[in-house]
Amino acid sequence: MEYNRFSNDKLGHEELIKLIKEQEIKIIVCEPTGGYESEICQELYNNKQQIHKVNTYSFNSFSQSMNLCKTDKKDAFKLAYYGDKMQLTANYLYQVESETLKRYQQRREDLVLMLSNEKKRLHHSIDGIDKESIEKLIKFLQNEIAELDKKLNEVIDESEELKEKVKILESVPGIGKCVGKKLISFLPELGNKNYSSNELSAIVGIAPYARDSGNKQGRRFIRGGRKIPRDALYMEVLAGKNGVKNGFQYLKALYDRLVNNYKPKKVAVVACMRKLLEVCHKLIQQKRCFVI
């Protein structure tokens, strides 16, 4: 197997694309590397190349089963072998609006976390020595968040598809503007007919995995997934199960039924999260708003 190494810059990207076209490679298998792969994936997609971004958990399990040492060359071989044996198909889709929305929303999440930390520091500022500095930073962060909100709204207003998604999501009880933007930013698969509700639950990390063997039935568990949309759904369900928000009767009924059947309360909460996600997914697919 031939091994080549390219720099992660414009020149390296051009060399890689040239080699791919010369060898008529059908699909490129890529491992997520914390965003370092984003630029080359975009360029490959713009050059009409088929790209598959592997699931890190699945690939790591496959990689460990091969019992090979850890080098760049071996890692490249593992990716190629994994793609061949698993018969992977393209799953990478680049859309300018979705990517822009995701970056703005991610930056907003970072600033909100910083703002929360600064408010805690202000609360514990006993003698007020650092109070003025903290208050200045809090005001700056609030202005930056407001500016990002404007940019997020501009991106959504420029796309009819995103506007429709946000409108449908906001019609669902408990899904306000903030949560709706989080879902469409970090879960672009939402409403896509190529994804079932179970697959979407697995992507978010709220799908139950069995652990059975013979006559033994182990406890189901959840793992992995995208943290920001999962956290957003969790907070909405916590409010809904207590009847805090109007229109949440269907979730409260599900929660009460599971708890009355002696299911652990956290199991009932996760089940409600899946139900809420399924409702959002189906409504966007059918292009209709929630009706109480």
Predicted regions and their residues:
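Short glycine-rich phosphate-binding loop at a beta-alpha junction
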Residues: 25-36
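Phosphate-backbone recognition surface of nucleic-acid-processing proteins
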Residues: 11, 183-261, 265
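Short Gly/Thr/Asp-enriched flexible loops that form oxyanion-binding sites at enzyme active sites
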Residues: 38-45
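Helix-hairpin-helix
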Residues: 165-188, 200
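Acidic, carboxylate-rich catalytic segments that either coordinate divalent cations
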Residues: 246-292
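Long, charge-rich intrinsically disordered scaffolds of nucleic-acid metabolism proteins
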Residues: 45, 52-168, 172
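Nucleic-acid-processing active sites and adjacent nucleic-acid-binding tracks
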Residues: 1-27
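Short alpha-helical scaffolding segments that buttress acidic/His motifs in well-ordered protein cores
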Residues: 101, 169, 183, 232-237, ...
